[in-house]
Amino acid sequence: MTAMEGASGSSFGIDTILSGAGSGSPGMMNGDFRSLGEARTTDFRSQATPSPCSEIDTVGTAPSSPISVTLEPPEPHLVTDGPQHHHHLHHSQQPPPPSAVPAQSLQPSPQQQPPPQPQSAAQQLGSAAAAPRTSTSSFLIKDILGDSKPLAACAPYSTSVSSPHHTPKQESNAAHESFRPKLEQEDGKTKLDKREDPQSDIKCHGTKEEGDREITSSRESPPVRAKKPRKARTAFSDHQLNQLERSFERQKYLSVQDRMDLAAALNLTDTQVKTWYQNRRTKWKRQTAVGLELLAEAGNYSALQRMFPSPYFYHPSLLGSMDSTTAAAAAAAMYSSMYRTPPAPHPQLQRPLVPRVLIHGLGPGGQPALNPLSNPIPGTPHPR
């Protein structure tokens, strides 16, 4: 190293190179070290070892350069336009993810190191100028989350170097790509569901219409129940009706033997005679109740006595102090007691209001005796 410095008359250390670049040397700023000789170029390559934190991968940007070189971005007026510069920009629009490569992994061995190839200043400046721009643009959110085709095109260049800084981005891309098929599957399922929904709506609509038809049909035609066939009404002849009426006037209730005899005499069945008597008694009780009310309201107890020849009755003089409602209730009680029907209890008839008077207990001249046993009339024998 010392011999080379003595031969050339200048030092090529990092400090010397940077100080020379700051002083405005055109050869140093343009990066053209070929005029200084092969020894200087070798010294520069030996001292310009790649940094582990270098974010510029020359495998993706400049395939002809075997090592990565960190350079300051040149001034815009120093960059010359050329076809090669456009060629580099075209291939490095979207650089691969940043990676930190160890120095010993990228530094070529003396046996495997290819001979240095001369590069023009435009190519070096183009690669140096394009590197910072593309390296900063790859960290945008839209570039990380978006599905950009230039990144996919540069994937073969970036896969040649593995780095721990490169793993999260690959995982995020893989997660993003694995998330997209899930979204597509869910979209496909929703589309299938939407396609199936009209069919299900049609099915539901069809079942609803069928249910409505069944309801309307059930309303229009109610279910036929198994009813017993109604018996035909018996048409009695005049002779049969006259004989039944005469028997009813004599006897309101028939015994089993009397009913069978009457049915045989009239050429009827026992059931027909029994049914006729039940209907006739119902009609008779209704007519009698109405008649008793009318008689009680009118006070005509002589007609009541003629209608119901009973040994016990309520005398008009005893019932004269009661109102019409009480008299009608008393008459109905007498009527029910005559024909063996259970009397309906009246609130005013819970206790006996008037005593029962014997017909033969009347005094001479038709004057009633309230208590013929305790107050005998003179001239009448005392009953013993």
UniProtKB/Swiss-Prot annotation:
Sequence ranges of Polar residues compositional bias: 157-175
Keyword NAD in record: no
Region named Disordered: 1-134, 154-235, 364-384
Cell compartment(s), UniProt: Nucleus
CDD domains in the cross-refs: homeodomain
SUPFAM superfamilies from the UniProt entry: Homeodomain-like
SMART domains per the UniProt record, alphabetical: HOX
Compositionally biased intervals (Basic and acidic residues): 177-217
Highest taxon listed in the record's lineage: Eukaryota
UniProt record similarity statement: Belongs to the BAR homeobox family.
Protein name: BarH-like 2 homeobox protein
